[in-house]
């Protein structure tokens, strides 16, 4: 018997609703009541917070049990309720895929790489300046003096002195070159900050692959360690179809699911094909996969260049709109300055292309990580060949489930609205 139904009523679900139904209801209600979607409603923020609190309680099994038995006063999270906007971003910001793909580091690492590269360049420049300052300038001074003497016709009068100076200068230059060579050798031994960071990231990536491999083996073991009949396979498919139906509504969830499914299916198919025809069966699939990697790389670079070009175009438009002087094209015709609406449209276009570039970069990273994970799972020499074949078959089955997942028209519309809100929330968070 539930003593208080207020939270259930806020989410519009029954007291017997499953955790999946509760999460879906929260997603739908939070979109409807989000303050950004109700700018002229002063009570929207309050309703949004109430919906968030309801989900924070009903979305936690222990808190939900306390709420059902004792009411809301006995069902307060240990650290208090989180801010609704923060909760909204955390729940639907991509963390749900962490056990499949780990934390996406590419975009973060790009920024860090640029910073470290700039630091290394500055340090290198500083070392060059210090080396120049430490090297004696006798040779240069003598060279200059000799040139001046020659111009003035004084070479005969100072011939002996010039020889001495030249000899001295040559010794100094030789010593300086020797010192520069030593500095250069030391510089090669000394790793730059960027190189150190790249090595650290490689270690972290391997740790991530190891952990994700263990998690994937556990998932596949639901089938591989079973009786392994048709009933078990159907049960396995149903379990992950339910999970996929929840994950598909995450931010870019459907794209991520399809990416995971493609890699699982592809790697499993290559492995299974390699077990036939003396291992020759997997060559075609492997070549096809390499072609896919090339195309993914090409799309990633193209999307980044496209976003960069759009950004440059927007900068030109902004400069033109703020310039008080009349503007002319290369033929001498006066150009019309862009309006506020045109600038807004270009900004919207840029946002879309930046998101596209970010997604292609993320997809490239996801694919790279998952290929490493699948390789480790299917090349595990601690288990029998029979187990590896079962793993590949289960992986292929899971890949099929994820590849076939789709959104209904209504779900797609809701997801698009939701993804816009997440992007806006992330943008606001960066500026606070």
Curated annotation (Swiss-Prot):
GO terms for molecular function: protein-folding chaperone binding. Pfam families: DnaJ, DnaJ-X. The keyword Chaperone applies. Residues 117-187 are annotated as: Disordered. Residues 4-73 form the J domain. Keywords: Chaperone, Cytoplasm. GO terms for biological process: protein import into peroxisome matrix; protein insertion into mitochondrial outer membrane; protein targeting to mitochondrion. GO terms for cellular component: cell periphery; cellular bud; cytosol; endoplasmic reticulum; mitochondrion. Disulfide bonds: none annotated. InterPro entries: DnaJ_domain (IPR001623), DnaJ_domain_CS (IPR018253), DnaJ_X (IPR026894), J_dom_sf (IPR036869), Peroxisomal_DnaJ (IPR052814). It is found in: Cytoplasm. Present with 8970 molecules/cell in log phase SD medium. Belongs to the DnaJ family. Interacts with SLN1. Required for peroxisomal protein import which maintains the function of peroxisomes. This is DnaJ-like protein 1. The lineage of its organism: Eukaryota, Fungi, Dikarya, Ascomycota, Saccharomycotina.
